[in-house]
Amino acid sequence: MEISKYKAVLALVMLQFTSAGVALFTKAAFMEGLNPTVFVVYRQAIATLFICPISFISAWRKENKPSLGVRGFWWVALTAVIGVTVNQNAYFKGIDLSSSSMACAMTNLIPAVTFIISIIVGFESIKRRSMKSVAKVIGTGVCVGGAMAMTFLRGPKLLNALLNQDNTAWLLGCFFLLISTFAWSLWLILQVPIASHCPDHLYTSACTCFIATIASFLVALALGNTHLPPWKLDSFLKLSCCIYSGFQLAISFFLQAWIVSQKGPVFSALFNPLSAVIVTFFGALYLKEQTYLGSLLGALAIILGLYIVLWGKSEDYQEESTDLKLENEHNTSSQSDIVSIMIGDKAFRSSELLEPLLM
């Protein structure tokens, strides 16, 4: 078989390895003294410097220049504050206080939390007689139960049992990771109004990164990082961690956008547990992170719940894709397919995703 058929799979596997690398890299840098809040500023700034020139060149080559408008700008600003600034600060503070394996396991809660928020805001409805709708509810419950087990039912130590860890710091770290999960889910929800104001995904992402950099810098100052010492990258590990994480953030955007355009959002989410497995193994091996029976069982429950939710979501995506195909058959003026990105039962479309994002 041609290897081109497996490009999306290879890209997703690579993305999971790079994401796992960020979790492990940052935990090691935090153990050496890197401030998580300062790290977020550096990461966002590097990602912005990478994305903005590409966005400018892409917009310059188009006949219809992208524009957000006043309302679109406020939606992007809200996304930058909640979905990026709050999300990343909470996520990396959670890694600092708990472990990188816990952080990666918690990210598997995102589809379930997004499902809950989608119901609240009206993007999703529960069909009692639909098996897949019931599956989404059951999967969400399993995910929540797994998260509670990871947080409170730690159980006996399986790896690195001789090391001690502060229980209060662990619980606080889990709390920050849950905040990050909700902020991440809100970021997904907010893509709907943003796309309705400006369908240029690259342009809106560049704007989001730029605003998030400013917001993250203000948060860092507000938390007391007003002197030079916290901002010094006085070791190779700290410097390389910031550079690697910044480029990974920028590159992951291109990979995710391309994968969604090829295979859809459900396919992309199926690979999320891979990073948790990678981080758990290497975290215990190199960072001496403690592994608990309760945490391991909770992580397995979250992964099980994730796949149950995704099985239920697959019907929504398939139905929407079928409707779009029928619509495109009757639309003779359109020469390209339209990709639907599902958020709940509703979708927003972006033909921009069909542009060659990976060269």
Curated annotation (Swiss-Prot):
What molecular functions are annotated in GO for this chain?
Answer: transmembrane transporter activity
TM region positions:
10-30, 37-57, 66-86, 103-123, 133-153, 170-190, 204-224, 240-260, 266-286, 292-312
Which InterPro entries has this protein been placed in?
A: EamA_dom, WAT1-related
Q: Which residues form the EamA domain?
A: 18-131, 199-310
Give membrane topology per the record.
Multi-pass membrane protein
Q: Where in or outside the cell is it found?
A: Membrane
Cellular component (GO) terms are: membrane
Enumerate the Pfam families for this protein.
EamA
State the similarity comment.
Answer: Belongs to the drug/metabolite transporter (DMT) superfamily. Plant drug/metabolite exporter (P-DME) (TC 2.A.7.4) family.
Q: What is this protein called?
A: WAT1-related protein At4g28040
The source organism is: Arabidopsis thaliana (Mouse-ear cress)
